[in-house]
Amino acid sequence: LPGWRLAVFTGVPEFGKSIGLRSFKQYKLFNGKLPAQLLLFEIQPENARTPRDPAAPGQVMPRIANPERADMLRNRLKKNLKTIGQWARKQNIGCYRLYDADMPEYALAIDIYEGRVHVQEYLAPKSIDEKAARERLAEAMAVIPEVLEVAPENLVCKQRQRQTGTKQYEKQAATGEYFNVHEHGCTLKVNLKDYLDTGLFLDHRPVRHWIQQHARGKRFLNLFCYTGAATVHAAVGGASRSLSLDMSKTYVSWAQDNLALNRADSRKHVVEQADCLAWLADRKTANQTFDLIFMDPPTFSNSARMAGV
């Protein structure tokens, strides 16, 4: 009833998101040795919130089944935050990998995107019990927001699998939740939920920075350009012109958006949908010359033009 108060004592604070109310007080306590929280609510219309749907894309309901094992992950994340996180802050890097299956019990990749967290669970081999794998993932999803001090709505979880055919390009969800991140003076658009990948390959960061440092006055070619992040670095670095090609119309549009975010001249920095291998084999291509070429072909072979994705 309006005006009443509600108290919930839980070892899984994430369950509080399912109540449909915003808590006005949160107390960190213990249930024996288990960390817990006391959540206080006022039943008022203005405190209503949309209950979190555990079946929604990227949602895994957290639960700690083995506190000792969860403590191991908690301590590892704290250690990585102290070392990798400190290094990233000193380098003014906002997007980086914090954890990459450091512990065999938790086969995850945890990436930071300027205050948001992207978690990918590596597909467990058939020898691993599926129930045990789900249990460990639920533990990780309880520990990660606690250690990283991130709101649950800013944490996304996916299962990482080897992609074949056009699956790498297909949508996993349809939230349309894009936001901008920053890297060496460039603004880049990312999406943590809708696709297998986010729009920014973190392991390419040193190469992108090198391109930016060496692009001034150069003609730049980006084959299999994905979202065009390398082209953005080239443009920001002063490339005289660039051509970026990809088979996916989704990523061609994304690359164009990235260039527009950085005020690159679309007449000088062109993005086109094309089969890169066919383009290389075309005799007309021989008349075009470039000073810098970046080529990162996908891990699968697919000769069909992906005109519809």
PLM regions with names:
Residues 1-63, 194-196, 200-209, 214, ...:
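Class I S-adenosyl-L-methionine-dependent methyltransferase catalytic core
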Residues 46-113, 120-139:
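Non-catalytic nucleic-acid substrate-recognition regions in nucleic-acid-modifying enzymes
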Residues 222-228:
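Class I SAM-dependent methyltransferase "Motif I" SAM/SAH-binding loop
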Residues 119, 294-295:
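Redox-cofactor binding/interface segments in oxidoreductases and associated redox assembly factors
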Residues 95, 99-111, 133-202, 209:
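Non-catalytic substrate-recognition/targeting regions of SAM-dependent transferases
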Residues 188, 207, 224, 296:
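Conserved hydrophobic/aromatic pocket- or pore-lining residues that grip, position, or stack substrates
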